[in-house]
Amino acid sequence: MATKGTVSGVIANMVTLVVDGPVAQNEICYISTGGDKLMAEVIKVVGSHVYVQVFESTRGLKVGAEAEFTGHMLEVTLGPGMLSKNYDGLQNDLDKMDGVFLKRGQYTYPLDKERVWHFVPLVKVGDEVGPSAWLGQVDENFQPLKIMVPFQLTGTYEVKSIVPEGDYTIEDTVVVLTDREGKDIPVNMIQKWPVKKAMTNYKEKPRPYKLLETGVRVIDTVNPIVEGGTGFIPGPFGTGKTVLQHAISKQAEADIVIIAACGERANEVVEIFTEFPELVDPHTGRKLMERTIIIANTSNMPVAAREASVYTAMTISEYYRAMGLKVLLMADSTSRWAQALREMSNRMEELPGPDAFPMDISAIISNFYGRAGYVHLNNGETGSITFIGTVSPAGGNLKEPVTENTKKVARCFYALEQERADRKRYPAVNPIDSYSKYLEYPEFEEYIAKRINGEWIGKVNEIKTRLLRGKEIAEQINILGDDGVPVEYHVIFWKSELIDFVILQQDAFDEVDSVTPMERQEEILNMVIDICHTEFKFDTFIEVMDYFKKMINLCKQMNYAKYKSEQYEDFKKQLQELVAERSV
């Protein structure tokens, strides 16, 4: 019999219940109020008193209201039909809800039960299968999706029967499995999985090493991220976090893109909803939305659902990874998720940590980032989740707890800087503070040596050193004035400016410059390094400035020209002539 409870206290969206039976941590219950049933999650159990966080507004909720427990945790429903959907944090289909505002206590089923899918069997009667083994395949938006053995099963099973190739709905039984005791288990296309629990349906999780091409030079060339890697983008407001995230999600080499807009401003989420259906996928020429799922929880939605939305997005990503797909997960912004954790922690009167965040914030963040990664599946295939989260530190302070704790677990750090944004140097990633720890991985070095060449990492480190030297000289020029430093110093400074303008800066709104393939990035890097190695002869700093401005202008024109086009080759020739003019 289901456990029941009555409300004994309400503090905003945290409700205390007195229960008459056993209750599990993270179990879901429904509280009845004025004809609505409000969904809530157990966050703390003390004897017969249970603390729950309600995923809706608790306005009008009275002491004495009744609650009924479901006996399961917060689960997502997984199956064909999720691509190109817009969900909220609890996986309600937003397109099925009408009205300007979401009504309280309104929940919708995330999948389409009527739609028919063309099922192709991948196993035959008598085969032995284990949890998450591939049983069949359906095509959704030209993406082959696998129908798998339910994840929660353990041990091995025998395929007793499988339907022939044909059209079925998600609720039709497509396979019947038999366990060791001879019990039949019918399997359809739907899976359920609790969001707070990581899926471990793979053989091993090696260190990731394959470069994930994004087309953004400051990432691919200077601080690369890998398939199955983790990265985060902190930065104050207006520095271009969202534009950079959109650029990555449009251009990255991923099969599935999942965007979790948790706690973002409503107008930014509307921007995603209106922009993404219009975008064309550069890899396939089809609409980008066909392989995208958006999970939206704006700032004005209840705090608890904001926390759930990040976990929902990660669980959906793990489901696609189990099919052997490359998934890109973007969370915008993890700070709002951490604030939701802080709010609940404060309401439960727990001991506060730094900035009143919970004491275990670092464990929560590292457990979450740990769910991403590159895996070898049980059948020998590989899948990956590349996770990039943005952090919006209050006042742009990168020393606050969320940024500090994320720094410990994320391998790539792209620090967006207000000063660069103010100077209109976009993307405003500070090349000196940012880093990618993947450059130190021997596996990555081997991969890059095969993919591009063995000197690549040495060249990347050289441009970082030159940028640092250029910054030091810029400070000296500021203090001593242009005449106060030798002409050679001006040359070093302008060579670092050349790297900044040609490699780091990129126009996200230009058709050509917004996406730079690796082949072109290699040519740009070699060209800039060759110029930096060239000795030039100048008499005054004004000559240096005028000469390098011409050079930067030619290089920028090359970036805007189609690769290997007549125009591109013409600018390249002009650049070579300009370099020859002053070289010693």
Question: What is each model feature region?
Answer:
Residues 97-140, 145-152, 169-229, 244-247, ...:
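P-loop NTPase nucleotide-binding/switch module
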Residues 27, 39-41, 54, 70-73, ...:
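Short beta-alpha junctions and helix-cap segments that line functional grooves
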Residues 20, 34, 72-73, 91, ...:
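Short, surface-exposed secondary-structure boundary micro-motifs
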Residues 1-103:
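N-terminal accessory targeting/assembly segments
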Residues 43-49, 80-91, 142-166, 184-199:
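Short, compositionally biased
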Residues 54, 59, 119-128, 159-167:
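Short histidine-centered loop motifs in beta-beta connectors
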